[in-house]
Amino acid sequence: AGTVPDKSLYAFPGVGLEGFGVLQSRFHENWCTYFGNRIGAGNQRRYNASYVYLTFPFPEGLTPDIPTADYADDPRAQAIAAAAARLNELRENWLNPPELIERVPEVVEGYPDRILPKDEAAAKELKKRTLTNLYNTRPAWLDHAHRALDEAVAEAYGWGDDYRAGTLTDDEILARLFRLNQERVSA
């Protein structure tokens, strides 16, 4: 409660853990940085589905127009999904540590449990635990989880060796993604 989503909220229906992983990767982040909009006094990035999501070249065979069940057995999708699940688990444990919260079953079947602070001290601490604060402090475990995810995504593109060799700079990633985008638009 206290937060009402507006037109700035984007939902990605039908995107499984592998799609979530690609969207959380350095590859998509670079695409967002280059093709996304800027807004406000701080010139903050703003996601734009038309310029970013719809033009982003997902790894071949793992694109959002293909049902996730169709590539469930693809080792590339499985590796991305595993790394994405681990990243999500680590972030969730930091955002909502078991010692500060209790999970209460939702009254409507099928909805996730409600997360409630155990007491007022927990509520105060939980208010500080935001994704923004987490990424601003960038603990080592978060970097490790993102590197594992980025490696899985690089493998899906066929760029795993270059990623491990450290030759995939942000500019090189963007150039390769742009070439893929152009190839797919031309096909």
Give, region by region, the residue ranges found by the protein language model.
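S-adenosyl-L-methionine
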Residues: A1-A187
